[in-house]
Amino acid sequence: DLNILIAQSEEGNPDAKFYLGSLYYIGRELKQDYSKALELFKEASERGNIAATFNLGVIYAKGRGVKIDEKKAFEYYKKAAFGGLPQAQYNYAIWLREGRVEDPKPIEAMEWFKVSSNKNFDRSLIELAKGYEDGTAGRRDYREAVKLYRRARANEDNRDNSPYLNSTFYLGKLYLRGLGVAKDEKKGLRFIKEAANGNVNDAIIE
């Protein structure tokens, strides 16, 4: 109930502040208001709600109701990553690898992909698998890559989303080449076709 949520938020409940902020952010049940969302997320974050901290990172990264501020976004992603949120750990790792705010730190980024993968976060599983394919995860290990792609693939309820389709594509390539798994061209092509049908660009090019 919205009234209960508002009352709990006014009493200082960080989770209520986070959920109320989310409603303002997406404009569900309440008129979309990025300023109110920002205020509530800040209050929730200060009271220890890690998801609110992550959302602050998204707001500053995308410029939702504020000027884009990558330095602030990076700090919020970092705080939420250290707070244990897998999505934040993934975003923080991407920004570390790309050198969005600081100099690129690919080794540290890979460690964060590993941490997030331990919580079965699909996009991190894919990045870690790619790291085992190209050796940036510390060693080249195609069998480990296959395992990780399979985990990312199995992790998805909705087969239309990008982590499922991307892991299907990369797994298909390994089946085609017989790397880390018994060579199976039929299966490999089937997987790549499935990814292409889902508009994975690399699969369409392949």
Which sequence ranges carry the predicted segments?
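N-terminal segments that cap or nucleate solenoid repeat domains
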Residues: D1-I26
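Canonical positions in the second alpha-helix
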Residues: Q8, E43-A44, K79-A80, V115-S116, ...
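Short helix-capping/linker turns of helical repeat alpha-solenoids
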Residues: E10-N13, I26-R28, D33, E46-N49, ...
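Hydrophobic face of amphipathic alpha-helices that form TPR/SEL1-like repeat modules
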Residues: Y19-I26, T53-K62, N91-E98, L125-D134, ...
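TPR/TPR-like (Sel1-like) alpha-helical repeat modules
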Residues: K186-N197
